[in-house]
Every structure is written in C-alpha cells, then in structure tokens.
Amino acid sequence: GEAGYADAAGMAQKVYDFEDTIARTVSWDRATRRNRDLTYTALTHAQVDELANGFPLETMLQKMGLGQTDRFIVSDIPPSAERAAELGLDEATLAKIGGGTPAMTTLIMNTPVEVLQAWTTKEMLENNAAILPKRFDDADFAFYGTLLQGTPEQRPRWKRSIAATEGMLGELVGKSYVERYFPAENKAAMIDLVSNLRKALAESIDEIDWMSDATKREAMAKLDSFDPKIGYRDNLETYPDLAITAGNPVANSMAAAEWGWQDMVSKLGQPIDRTEWFMLPQTVNAYYNSTKNEIVFPAAILQQPFFGISADDAVNYGGIGAVIGHEMGHGFDDQGSKSDATGMLRNWWTDADRQAFDKLGNA
C-alpha cells in the first residue's frame, strides 16, 4: 500500500480491531460523558503516574511540555464503588462506563508496536485528508461523509479552503469578518436584548413554586453574574509567530497545530483569561460556558434571519431572543446547574430542590 505495508489489508484489519477494542472497553457513551460529576477528576502528578500501567507516561508528559505540571483534570476515570454510591449511579449507568484512561494505557502496552505505528499513520492521514492529494480526501469523504452520514457530495473546494484556513488562522479571518459585517450598533442592541431576557428569566425563577428561597437566591446570583460576550473578543489573535509557507499546506497545518499547543501550554499556572472565546466571530452558533458562567454570541449569528439592527423588536426577540434564552437555560439545565455563579463545580441546591428538579426533568 501507499503507506509502505506489504499486507495493507491485513494491517488495516489489525488497526480496526484495535479501535474496536477502544470502543468496546475504553470509551464511555456520550450520555455518560455529559455527567460532570463523573468527568471531573482532579489528580496530582503522582496519581496520574499510577494510571500508566507500564506506559511511558512521564516521557510523554515531558515531550508535551507538561512535565512540571502538578495537577491534572482527567475526564475518564471510572468511579470507585464508594464514589458510584455517593453519586447514586445504578447498574445500568455503570454498565455504560468504559475503562477510560487506565484501560487505554493497558491496551497500548499490550498492542504490538507495529500496530500502534499503523494506527498513528492512519490518524495522520485521516486528520490531514483535506490537505493531502485528492485521492486521500475523496476516500476520507466517501467513508465519513457518504457512508456514515449520507452526504452525497463534498462542499465546493472554495468552502473547504476557507474551513482549512479558519482551522489554522481562525481569529485572523474573524478580524476581517467583523470589520466588514459587524458594526458597533449591533453590539449595543444585543446588550439591551440580553438585559431584557435576563429580567424575564429572573421573573420566571421567582415564580417557581417548588423551589425554596435559599436555592432561588443562589439561582438569582448566578443569573446576575452571567457574563454576556457579544460579537467578538477585543484582542483577536494575529499569530505573529506562526510561519506560513505558500504551497505547503501540510507543513502549515503542522505549524499551526504546534503553535496552538504551545499557546495552550503557556497558559498553565496563569490566571484564567476571561476574555478568551471558544468560538470564532464568523461561526453561526452560540454557547454557554459553565466554568466561566458566560453566554457567548459570535458576530455571525447576529445577522439575518436571527437579528437585524433595523428589524422590528418582535422579529429580533423571536429570532436571536430565542437563542439568548436557550443559552441562558443551559446555565440551569441538568449539567449547567451543577456550577455556581463563579463557575465552580458546587452543589448550591437544597437536597429537596434538587430531587424536585431531577424528577421534573425525568418526567
């Protein structure tokens, strides 16, 4: 095969079997991964080392620039029997929890190195298919796009090119977008919309008949602390240290990935940057982030048909207003409600109120 394997089909089967084992014995199902009580496990460096099961974890951490890190959050550690009882997990839920990180390190140590190398090769080809020769991109789309998702054909090449550029230089593209499509008056109008919907939600919380005054006070404090971010962040990244070479998209992609990783590692041990966004200005979407208690509305969703500066109020409330209410609601849904006004994972509900909430949610 093109990757240099004499028996490409045979090696492909071994890689398939490796990934099948990951899916069956390591991975957690998506519903279980939503449970923040299960996926937030703070460990010391020494405790992380205990998960290695012979895997050269310390070498990997050093290579990643994490050798001096003294605290880690590991998202897929199966709960102990005591922790499972504390969380009230039933047998059906426990059955959906895979072996996680400990199982993965054990699997790697028990897998022949040539299979791991082939798997890594497959991952590299798959992740870079869009910028490799057309036959790789076509094969990747035929499987992931058509076979798995039923999409009959690729997007036009120019759209894929924009997506690739956004993946590497997203905020620089965003800077051009907001200069052209997001005037200052749009932000001012959105601030008013958010303020009015915040008042409406406060009235709704106040009228809840099953919630105690103590929990309502916490809920109101959280609502008052919502940090609305509108349009774009003030200091969009310009990537001054990222070298881009014309005619070499693979090298550019690798350089961008390295830049992104180093940028992330540089933030370790630093105060949380509350100006940072997790979406680009040109993304037609919005989100609520429980760890910062923020609601974020990129510039691209603040366009017709969701929002128009000259549109009737009814149109804007029916469009972007519904989106604002939706994102605010995430602050009080089954997972968002586990964080307090500061974004800390803290139970601010009385036991009776939490039970009533869960009962209504499961009705």
Residue ranges with predicted function:
Residues 1-192, 196:
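Noncatalytic, helix-rich "gating/capping" subdomain that lines the substrate-entry/channel surface
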Residues 157-165, 169, 186-197, 215, ...:
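Secondary-structure capping and boundary motifs in well-ordered enzyme cores
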Residues 212, 297, 314-337:
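Active-site recognition of the HExxH zinc-binding catalytic motif
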